[in-house]
Amino acid sequence: MPHRSLVCFAAPADKKAFMELVKTLRYRTEAPISDCSAALKETDGDMDAAMQVLRKRGAARAMKKGDRVTEHGFVVSCVGSTPASGAAIVTICSETDFAARNEHFQKVCVQARDQLCKLMDATNGAVLANPEEAVKHLSDVMAEELRVAIAVLGENMRVRSIAPLVPAPHMSERLLIGSYTHGSLNVDNVGRIVGLVALSQVRENEVVPKDVLTSVGRHFVATSGAEGNYAHQNFFGSETETVGKWLKQRGLKFSSSLVQEFGKEPVVHTAPEPHR
């Protein structure tokens, strides 16, 4: 009796079994159904071999799409586990807004956030000293995730930039970091605009609620285009309290802020050195 491989499925039972293999391969790789089917036929139903075929094809597609223009995407807030680890805003790009709103793209954004936070913690923030090198490092770490997403979405994707939050040198003790994300798609720390703030505690070991830090980040997002002394601005949502007064009442001093809107230059404020 002649040998019958998966290439030659004819009986209904065989077809059903083949489709189960296709379903499993798609679940594992997130590749299109047509690609999964072709890879399984090419490898006579060998799941591991089919996965290798898909990886090679995905890598080839990623290389072909690597030079295509990426003008859409989101910014991602990355805050280390301690203030010493630092904080930064990562910009992740795709070719179209449609792809940027896809769950696979947003998954890459979350992976980028987690990977950069790990690097920041492992290096005590030193990875942020050279933002361009940090982009290369993160891109290398994310190479497999980017390749898979490019293969699934059919569009180029890349880590465009990393903007670090730099505290004022004379106000680097007892630091706290706050983050606020605007225009998110129900994905934590991923949105159209991110605001980061570094604040110094006046009283050591005092617990500062997270929502206080978030409120300061929200203020700088809302007023990022404003000119003049930020300390004398009305705090966002208040008609009577200035930023300086609002912070003082909560035992905090402003050190620096960073606001990044996708596609625009970052806006930075840094506390001036006191007059001697």
Swiss-Prot record:
Associates with the EF-Tu.GDP complex and induces the exchange of GDP to GTP. It remains bound to the aminoacyl-tRNA.EF-Tu.GTP complex up to the GTP hydrolysis stage on the ribosome. GO terms for cellular component: mitochondrion. The keyword Repeat does not apply. GO terms for molecular function: translation elongation factor activity. InterPro entries: EF-Ts_dimer_sf, Transl_elong_EFTs/EF1B, Transl_elong_EFTs/EF1B_dimer, UBA-like_sf. Gene3D superfamilies: DNA helicase RuvA subunit, C-terminal domain, Elongation factor Ts, dimerisation domain. This protein may be expected to contain an N-terminal transit peptide but none has been predicted. PANTHER family: ELONGATION FACTOR TS, ELONGATION FACTOR TS, MITOCHONDRIAL. This is Elongation factor Ts, mitochondrial. It comes from Leishmania infantum. GO terms for biological process: mitochondrial translational elongation. It is found in: Mitochondrion. Keywords: Elongation factor, Mitochondrion, Protein biosynthesis. Its main location: mitochondrion. Pfam families: EF_TS. HAMAP family: EF_Ts. Belongs to the EF-Ts family.
